[in-house]
Amino acid sequence: MIRAGIIGATGYTGLELVRLLKNHPEAKITYLSSRTYAGKKLEEVFPSTLENSILSEFDPEKVSKNCDVLFTALPAGASYDLVRELKGVKIIDLGADFRFDDPGVYREWYGKELSGYENIKRVYGLPELHREEIKNAQVVGNPGCYPTSVILALAPALKHNLVDPETILVDAKSGVSGAGRKEKVDYLFSEVNESLRPYNVAKHRHVPEMEQELGKISGKKVNVVFTPHLVPMTRGILSTIYVKTDKSLEEIHEAYLEFYRNEPFVHVLPMGIYPSTKWCYGSNHVFIGMQMEERTNTLILMSAIDNLVKGASGQAVQNMNIMFGLDETKGLEFTPIYP
């Protein structure tokens, strides 16, 4: 059995990790940490978890002794120094601290210097693109939720030079859980209910992550114009992407079917069928649809994911499976919740 620990176990992604790992046939939870609720049983704070493990403050000695893998479900900037204290434990970080090739990009967008970053061997944890590297990784930077939806939607088109990478327009909509479990007026029920609003326009921190990975795929410089929106639902991301092309929809669709033919979690929809966030609710599945706007030679791509599962904790478990030589669908085989 894989001994798994979670730091930040009482945030939304941490709780989702608890749910997934409790139902994983090859893993068991051996360490849970929460600064806010240290000393309490998890089920005292969140009865739905049915988990009687006691939450503790972070203790690197306990982690090294009791864990084979540690999931760090902390805000950006909080994991880096903790991880550097650990030896002999595989790390899957759900924050942004290990996602970037260039620490200067992280410094520019997240405002923190990562001392010694170049000495840490890390892999960007998007299995559909980096499966082989993940197999031997010691530290995995789990992708962000928006980048997961956008990169998977664009990867085949950029890989096969089917679209112009110079300017990619992304309009994305996310459920409120994407903002994390925090007290803020913007996320009160009366503020988000029956409301739709953009946020972090032209300055969202996920943009450089998208451009880094999409640039690797295409081999060219990629420019992403990204506008996220908050919608009154708990889970889910729907990304709609606009990109220029001189190819036919049929050719592009066939390329997508071939690219994702053997991927267990990515589903390319028939032409004329468009994805819904309801289809992936509570699951690790991704649905991709497409249409051509022929007047302007614009390919419109649409992708739907659950931001807490494939966009965070489910993808982290998928990475764990790969790192430990398991079938990557282990513990993730369940179908989405519907309705």
From Swiss-Prot:
Compartment annotation: Cytoplasm
Pathway(s) it belongs to: Amino-acid biosynthesis; L-arginine biosynthesis; N(2)-acetyl-L-ornithine from L-glutamate: step 3/4
Superkingdom per UniProt: Bacteria
Known catalytic reactions: N-acetyl-L-glutamate 5-semialdehyde + phosphate + NADP(+) = N-acetyl-L-glutamyl 5-phosphate + NADPH + H(+)
One GO biological process term: L-arginine biosynthetic process
Main location class: cytoplasm
EC nos: 1.2.1.38
Annotated catalytic residues: 145
Gene Ontology terms: cellular component: cytoplasm
GO molecular function annotations of the record: N-acetyl-gamma-glutamyl-phosphate reductase activity; NAD binding; NADP+ binding
Swiss-Prot/TrEMBL keywords: Amino-acid biosynthesis, Arginine biosynthesis, Cytoplasm, NADP, Oxidoreductase
Role summary: Catalyzes the NADPH-dependent reduction of N-acetyl-5-glutamyl phosphate to yield N-acetyl-L-glutamate 5-semialdehyde.
Family from the record: Belongs to the NAGSA dehydrogenase family. Type 1 subfamily.
Protein's UniProt name: N-acetyl-gamma-glutamyl-phosphate reductase
The species this protein was found in: Thermotoga sp. (strain RQ2)
Gene (UniProt): argC
